[in-house]
């Protein structure tokens, strides 16, 4: 009987010792955990700024249409612009006044006349800024001339005389003053999208771009 009691005492002591060890280990882990400092969160992605030349500005006046004869019914209208930093043209936009019916095609040209992008507008509103986001943004170089334009299939447009007689600058973008790099406020009578190469009264035809940088 004494052997059994001794065995039980020994077993109880071992069990108590085991529980004590588990308790002490738990306290130790809790102390270590309480001092744990999580790593800082990853930095947020860089903010990409985007800007347009004319912002929320809007022209006054009504839709115009030049009768040219000779079976030419369309017109292409554009603006020469530069960015002071490298960037990407995300969209080409134009201001539409009531009555500017027909199909419209956005285009972007390099200064040497190379076509960089051409897409047809869809889901236009009756008036206001019409924005076409390019299927693939076009990279542009700083301080380099580009031409943003749109083709109006029925020859409708809005213009502001002498609107580009002086440069128009917003943030990193500048619509060049007429004669800074050749003509500006450019147009061309045509029945299909084509690089505009004429100018009249330094007109602003309210063509614009959205550039990210």
Per-region residue spans from a language model:
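Beta-sheet-rich sandwich/jelly-roll-like modules and their strand-loop junctions
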Residues: 30-111, 154-213
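Solvent-exposed serine/threonine-rich low-complexity stretches and specific carbohydrate-binding patches
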Residues: 115-125
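C-terminal motif of bacterial Sec signal peptides marking the signal peptidase cleavage site
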Residues: 25-28
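Short beta-strand segments enriched for Tyr within beta-sheet-rich domains
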Residues: 92, 143-152
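Sec-dependent signal peptide recognition
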Residues: 13-19
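Exposed aromatic-hydrophobic patches
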Residues: 129-137
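N-terminal secretory signal peptides that target proteins for export/translocation
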Residues: 1-12
């Amino acid at each position: 009987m004494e052997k059994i009691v001794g065995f039980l005492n020994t077993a109880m002591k071992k069990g108590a010792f085991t529980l004590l060890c588990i308790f002490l280990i738990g306290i130790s882990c809790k102390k270590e955990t309480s001092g744990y400092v999580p790593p800082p969160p990853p930095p947020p992605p860089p903010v990409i700024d985007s800007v347009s030349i004319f912002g929320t500005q809007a022209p006054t006046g009504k839709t115009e249409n030049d009768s040219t004869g000779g079976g030419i019914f369309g017109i292409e209208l554009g603006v020469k612009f530069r960015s002071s930093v490298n960037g990407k043209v995300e969209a080409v936009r134009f201001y539409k006044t009531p009555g500017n019916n027909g199909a419209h095609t956005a285009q972007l040209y390099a200064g040497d006349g190379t076509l960089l992008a051409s897409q047809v507008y869809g889901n236009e509103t009756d008036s206001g800024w019409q924005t076409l986001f390019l299927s693939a943004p076009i990279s542009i170089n700083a301080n380099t001339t580009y031409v943003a334009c749109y083709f109006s299939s029925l020859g409708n447009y809005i213009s502001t005389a002498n609107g580009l007689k002086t440069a128009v600058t917003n943030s990193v973008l500048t619509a060049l003053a007429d004669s800074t790099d050749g003509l500006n406020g450019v147009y061309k009578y045509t029945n299909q999208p084509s690089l505009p190469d004429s100018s009249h009264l330094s007109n602003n035809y309210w063509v614009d771009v959205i550039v990210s940088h």
